[in-house]
Swiss-Prot record:
Keywords: ATP-binding, Ligase, Magnesium, Metal-binding, Nucleotide-binding, Tricarboxylic acid cycle
Organism: Pseudomonas paraeruginosa (strain DSM 24068 / PA7) (Pseudomonas aeruginosa (strain PA7))
Top EC class for this record: ligase
Residues engaged in binding ATP: K46, G53, R54, G55, E99, T102, E107
Protein name in UniProt: Succinate--CoA ligase [ADP-forming] subunit beta
Its biological purpose: Succinyl-CoA synthetase functions in the citric acid cycle (TCA), coupling the hydrolysis of succinyl-CoA to the synthesis of either ATP or GTP and thus represents the only step of substrate-level phosphorylation in the TCA. The beta subunit provides nucleotide specificity of the enzyme and binds the substrate succinate, while the binding sites for coenzyme A and phosphate are found in the alpha subunit.
Pathway(s) where this gene product acts: Carbohydrate metabolism; tricarboxylic acid cycle; succinate from succinyl-CoA (ligase route): step 1/1
One Gene Ontology biological process: succinyl-CoA metabolic process
Signal peptide: none
Length: 388
C-alpha cells in the first residue's frame, strides 16, 4: 500500500524530521487559505497522486500569489493526472499539497528497502538526488552508498555519520543527517514499511538539511497490525480490477496484453505467462486464484479478467492438488454461463481428477477448448486471440 506525499510528511514530522510547513487541501478556497496560514510570498503546490513524474506532467508548480494557488487547485482537483508512471487514464487528484518554498543549494538522495537476499533493511544514499535513482544505480552504481541495518540493534548513529562523511557533508550537517537517518530507520521498522524514499533530501542555502519529498510503501501483509496506516489508504488510487480482486483474495496484476490468464499458484502463473510469451502471445494479466479455487472465486476471476476490453481469449491453467480438477471444471462451466463469456476459453487441467475434469468440460456443450498440455494450451490460446 502506498501513501501520498502529504501523509508521508506527517509521519516524518512525528519523528522530528525536518519537513516543509504545508497543508493538504481539497478545495480551491482552502488552497488560498493555506497560503495565508503558511505565510511568505512563494509557495509550492503539488497534486497528490501515487505516481512519480508529477513535475514534468504539470502536477507541481511554484506560485507567487494566493490566486495562482487557487487556480492550480481548480485546474487539478477532480481531474486525472497522467505521468510516465501511470497508464493512459492517469490517476485522480483529490488533494493538493500547499507548502512553503525552500531555497535549495544541493540535492541528495536517501532511501531504504527490505533487501531480500540479506533479509535486512538496507539504506541507500547518493549525491545524485532529485533524479530517478534506478537510472543512477544502472549508469553509475558506484554513486550509491549503502548501510545495512542489523535487526538486533537497529540503525546506529555511526552508520549515519559514515554515510554523511561519504556524501561530503560537514560540521552540523553530519549531526543533522545522522538524526534523519536514525529517525527514518525507526519509522521504517515501527510502521512495517517495504520502501521509503526522500528524493530529494536537500541542503538549503543556509546549510541545513531538509526532507523535500516523502515516498512510502507499506508491506500490505502487515496492515492488520497498522490500523493508523490502514486509515490512510486512498482507494481512488487503486486499479479498480486489482481492488475487486483483493476483496475476493485473488492475486491480480493488470498487464498490457490481450490474453487473460487464470491460474492456481503464483509460480505456475508466472510460468504460464512465460510460455504464452514464448509462443508469441501477450498476457493481459497475472491472476492467481490460490489453492481454494471455488466456483464463486472462479466466477469473480472471470469477471475481473473480462472487464479488460483488450482481452481476446482466456487461458485457464489449473494443477489439481488439494483442489479436484472436476470441481474446478464445474466452477468454470458455471462461471462461463453466469458471466456470459464471449471470447474463446482454453482450459488445461492436470493432477487430481484431471481426466474427469476434461470429461465434464467436453460434455458441457460450451465453447471451451480443452488442451492436452501446457504447450498445447499456450499455442491454442495464442491462435484464438489472433482469431485463427
Amino acid at each position: 500500500m502506498n501513501l501520498h506525499e502529504y501523509q508521508g510528511k506527517q509521519l516524518f514530522a512525528e519523528y522530528g524530521l525536518p519537513v516543509s510547513k504545508g497543508f493538504a487541501v481539497d478545495t480551491p478556497e482552502e488552497a488560498a487559505e493555506a497560503c495565508d496560514k503558511i505565510g511568505g510570498g512563494e509557495w509550492v503546490v503539488k497534486a497528490q497522486v501515487h505516481a512519480g513524474g508529477r513535475g514534468k506532467a504539470g502536477g507541481v508548480k511554484l506560485v507567487k500569489s494566493k490566486e495562482d494557488a487557487k487556480a492550480f487547485a481548480q485546474q487539478w482537483l477532480g481531474k486525472n493526472l497522467v505521468t510516465y508512471q501511470t497508464d493512459a487514464n492517469g490517476q485522480p487528484v483529490s488533494k493538493i499539497l500547499v507548502e512553503s518554498c525552500t531555497d535549495i543549494d544541493k540535492e541528495l538522495y536517501l532511501g531504504a528497502v527490505v533487501d531480500r537476499s540479506s533479509r535486512r533493511i538496507v539504506f541507500m544514499a547518493s549525491t545524485e538526488g532529485g533524479v530517478d535513482i534506478e537510472k543512477v544505480a544502472h549508469d553509475t552504481p558506484e554513486k550509491i552508498l549503502k548501510a545495512t541495518i542489523d535487526p538486533l540493534v537497529g540503525a546506529q548513529p555511526y552508520q549515519g555519520r559514515e554515510l554523511a562523511f561519504q556524501l561530503g557533508l560537514k560540521g552540523d550537517q553530519i549531526k543533522q543527517f545522522t538524526h534523519i537517518f536514525v529517525g527514518l530507520a525507526k519509522l521504517f521498522q515501527d510502521y512495517d514499511l517495504a520502501l521509503l524514499e526522500v528524493n530529494p533530501l536537500v541542503i538549503k542555502k543556509d546549510g541545513n538539511l531538509h526532507c523535500l519529498d516523502a515516498k512510502i510503501n507499506i508491506d500490505s501483509n502487515a496492515l492488520y497490525r497498522q490500523p493508523k496506516l490502514r486509515a490512510m489508504h486512498d482507494p481512488s488510487q487503486d486499479d479498480a480490477r486489482e481492488a475487486h480482486a483483493q476483496k475476493w483474495e485473488l492475486n491480480y496484476v493488470a498487464l498490457e496484453g490481450n490474453i487473460g490468464c487464470m491460474v492456481n499458484g503464483a509460480g505456475l502463473a508466472m510460468g504460464t505467462m512465460d510460455i504464452v510469451n514464448l509462443h508469441g502471445g501477450k498476457p493481459a494479466n497475472f491472476l492467481d486464484v490460490g489453492g481454494g479455487a471455488t466456483k464463486e472465486r472462479v466466477t469473480e476471476a472471470f469477471k475481473i479478467i473480462l472487464s479488460d476490453s483488450n482481452v481476446k481469449a482466456v487461458l485457464v491453467n489449473i494443477f489439481g492438488g488439494i483442489v479436484r480438477c472436476d470441481m474446478i471444471a464445474e466452477g468454470i462451466i458455471g462461471a462461463v454461463k453466469e458471466v456470459g463469456v464471449k471470447v474463446p476459453v482454453v482450459v488445461r487441467l492436470e493432477g487430481n481428477n484431471a481426466e474427469l475434469g476434461a470429461k465434464v468440460l467436453a460434455e458441457s456443450g460450451l465453447n471451451i477448448i480443452a488442451a492436452t498440455s501446457l504447450t498445447d494450451a499456450a499455442q491454442q490460446v495464442v491462435k484464438a486471440a489472433e482469431g485463427k
